[in-house]
């Protein structure tokens, strides 16, 4: 049993395998593969399953980067996504992100498919590796004045400009073409293309943080929980207290029992 290290307890081996990184797992499993102890055998099996799952996840992310390059080419490629389109309070937020092909941000996906904690972690990694990140926020009163279609076009143009880049290609997820030059629309792009997914995550995390801050100013509207969307608690608060300056008046008519505004 050449590969067995008898001086190391089975519990220690199991702990080592459980904490091993994706890159470390194959060598560790090879090192302990002839160890006959059941705890070690089970730990190796769990590690291999974890490695296989992570490998599949990395292949998914690799595909997102490859499609980004396929559609965008070798020039400056920026991904754009928005959050807050359907909310009744708070801004419309658009983010634009330029990602290099390397290093890759493992785990990126459509922000709606990620937990808040996962989005927070990924937003830090995206900020570390991105070539550029830009934001544009359209205030509720401006959304009321210009309408959502124009607001999105304005925000897309503003976010791309905020990157400081002149992109050769702008990849967008369902946003209106014509807002910026060299734009390409990709249906469900936030789940298919790396830079759009990154923009989706950054937009969501940034706007959510804004809504939590607004909640401290207007606690009666439950903005930290609802993020400005029409939750039952938020609707009831609108009916009870009327609207505050964060509300989109044009979105809230059905919720008001009186004409009382702010």
Language-model-detected regions and their locations in the chain:
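RNase H-like, Mg2+-dependent phosphodiesterase core
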Residues: 1-78, 85-262
């Amino acid at each position: 049993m050449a590969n067995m290290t008898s001086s190391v307890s089975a519990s220690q081996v199991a702990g080592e395998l459980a904490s091993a990184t994706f890159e470390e797992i194959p060598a560790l499993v090879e090192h302990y593969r002839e160890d006959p102890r059941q705890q070690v055998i089970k730990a190796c099996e769990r590690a291999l399953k974890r490695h296989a799952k992570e490998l599949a996840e990395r292949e998914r992310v690799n595909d997102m980067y490859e499609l980004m390059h396929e559609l965008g080419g070798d020039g400056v490629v920026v991904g754009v996504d928005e959050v807050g389109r359907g909310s009744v309070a708070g801004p419309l937020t658009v983010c634009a992100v330029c990602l290099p092909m390397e290093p890759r941000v493992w785990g990126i996906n459509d922000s709606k498919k990620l937990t808040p904690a996962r989005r927070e972690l990924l937003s830090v990694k995206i900020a570390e590796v991105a070539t550029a990140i830009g934001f544009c926020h359209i205030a509720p009163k401006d959304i009321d004045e210009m309408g959502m279609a124009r607001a999105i076009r304005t925000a897309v143009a503003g976010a791309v400009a905020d990157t400081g880049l002149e992109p050769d290609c702008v990849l967008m997820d369902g946003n209106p073409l014509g807002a910026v030059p060299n734009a390409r629309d990709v249906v469900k792009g936030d789940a298919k293309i790396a830079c759009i997914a990154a923009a989706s995550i950054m937009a969501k995390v940034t706007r959510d943080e804004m809504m939590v801050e607004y909640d401290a100013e207007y606690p009666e509207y439950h903005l930290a929980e609802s993020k400005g969307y029409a939750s039952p608690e938020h609707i009831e608060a609108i009916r009870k207290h009327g609207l505050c300056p964060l509300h989109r008046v044009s979105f809230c008519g059905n919720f008001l029992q009186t004409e009382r505004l702010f």
